[in-house]
Swiss-Prot record:
This is Transcription factor TCP15. Induction: Circadian-regulation with the lowest expression in the middle of the dark period. Induced during seed imbibition. Induced by cytokinin. InterPro entries: TF_TCP_subgr, Transcription_factor_TCP. GO terms for biological process: cell division; circadian rhythm; DNA endoreduplication; gynoecium development; inflorescence development; regulation of anthocyanin biosynthetic process; regulation of DNA-templated transcription; response to cytokinin. Expressed in archespores, pollen mother cell, ovule primordia and megaspore mother cells. Expressed in young proliferating tissues. Expressed in developing embryos, and seeds during germination. It is found in: Nucleus. Residues 141-153 have a biased composition (Polar residues). Disruption phenotype: Reduction in inflorescence height and pedicel length. Delayed germination. It comes from Arabidopsis thaliana. The keyword DNA repair does not apply. GO terms for molecular function: DNA-binding transcription factor activity; transcription cis-regulatory region binding. Residues 20-36 have a biased composition (Low complexity). Residues 51-63, 307-325 have a biased composition (Basic and acidic residues). Plants overexpressing TCP14 exhibit altered plant development and occasionally are lethal.
Amino acid sequence: MDPDPDHNHRPNFPLQLLDSSTSSSSTSLAIISTTSEPNSEPKKPPPKRTSTKDRHTKVEGRGRRIRMPAMCAARVFQLTRELGHKSDGETIEWLLQQAEPAVIAATGTGTIPANFTSLNISLRSSRSSLSAAHLRTTPSSYYFHSPHQSMTHHLQHQHQVRPKNESHSSSSSSSQLLDHNQMGNYLVQSTAGSLPTSQSPATAPFWSSGDNTQNLWAFNINPHHSGVVAGDVYNPNSGGSGGGSGVHLMNFAAPIALFSGQPLASGYGGGGGGGGEHSHYGVLAALNAAYRPVAETGNHNNNQQNRDGDHHHNHQEDGSTSHHS
């Protein structure tokens, strides 16, 4: 059997395929090696940009990033650590709360949303300033009402509320109320202080004292001089040396102005030691003498109203009897 003459010349296809595959892999390795060579070289750092502007630091605050000078940012960071805040934005909000009154004074508007938690400080300060301004501008405040004005208002209100048949009883009670309220409104003050001139009622001069062994009491009722009288109280036992305690000041209301025409004390200004031997009136005696005409006037008005009421009642009875007859 003869071998096939084309058997030796038949191409071996699997071997050729293997050769081609190995050659392709070698070429791919060569490509990879050539591409990796440039990456191995170190990259040069970019040159630093030099700017003439001031350096700023970004600080987190209120949902966005803001820019501020480096000194301010350093202070904010320090305050965040000292106050124990969780973030720098909380520190900035705290700073705005502290500066809110100054911001409102400078711009007229606030920088923080209007809620009570953030505006507590500014609301408190503005409320106190408004109340102080109101007290300064009010002509007659709560603490400086004149006793005469308050009693007049009280009597008018009482007269409007009560019926007409109780007018005679209300007049007597109102006169008693007037006496008690005016006596309660007298302010006995020492040399420590006194009311301002604009708030003291218009009064007249009045001096009085007790017996010869007591110091002289000075009651300042002069509308032109409402301060404390300078110097010491006159002491009769000191022989004109000027010893004794401080001046006791009493501000009387307007009804005491009737004292200005009465010679209550004649020896209060004596230079010698015998000045206290002259006629001196006690404080209680002077006050009783002052208010006795007021009480008599009230009783006289009460009796007059009772007589008028009885006359009117008798006139009505006479008219009714004549009508029945």
